[in-house]
């Protein structure tokens, strides 16, 4: 049984068009309040983005669900996340696939996320402090790549690290941002625009 607050959020997400029950089950299973500061715990199950420090945010649950659904994951999917942040999106992915690779440019956030994931007994995640623009070449290719911050254009390195048939989901743009889905097929990249969004920028380089 899920709490009334969790059920209310799930009902809202279904009303917004989220159809993948496995994704919804993952959202219900991950305690979002563990990924926000105490001051925001009462708002943890509201369908809003919340600040996590360092100028970053934990994404709105709808956007987490939408982007995850667009990845078309199976348990065997090899997944790369760019922007570990709080670790919340990472935890959702870890409930859906056997292993997740995640890159974070801010070391303090990476450490906090690793601690949260460990406290929740989610050990099927590898995190790395590095430049998200470069992906994780040593672990490539990936069946799915998700980016939780917006570059002004799609990073070439991420496209080349997709396996055949793989899917990349990311926000793209500066003043005006759009969620894009990129599918690699036969040496070509098919790009679909999903909807208008608002994310923090994907900054190049790594930060100590």
Swiss-Prot record:
GO cellular component: cytoplasm
CDD domains: AdoMet_MTases (cd02440)
Reaction(s) catalysed by this chain's protein: [protein]-L-isoaspartate + S-adenosyl-L-methionine = [protein]-L-isoaspartate alpha-methyl ester + S-adenosyl-L-homocysteine
Keyword flag Zinc-finger: no
Superkingdom field: Bacteria
EC number: 2.1.1.77
This protein's UniProt keywords: Cytoplasm, Methyltransferase, S-adenosyl-L-methionine, Transferase
Compartment(s) where it occurs, according to its Swiss-Prot or TrEMBL record: Cytoplasm
Quaternary assembly: Monomer.
Function comment: Catalyzes the methyl esterification of L-isoaspartyl residues in peptides and proteins that result from spontaneous decomposition of normal L-aspartyl and L-asparaginyl residues. It plays a role in the repair and/or degradation of damaged proteins. This enzyme does not act on D-aspartyl residues.
Name the UniProt record assigns to this protein: Protein-L-isoaspartate O-methyltransferase
Species of the source: Escherichia coli (strain K12)
Gene this protein is translated from: pcm
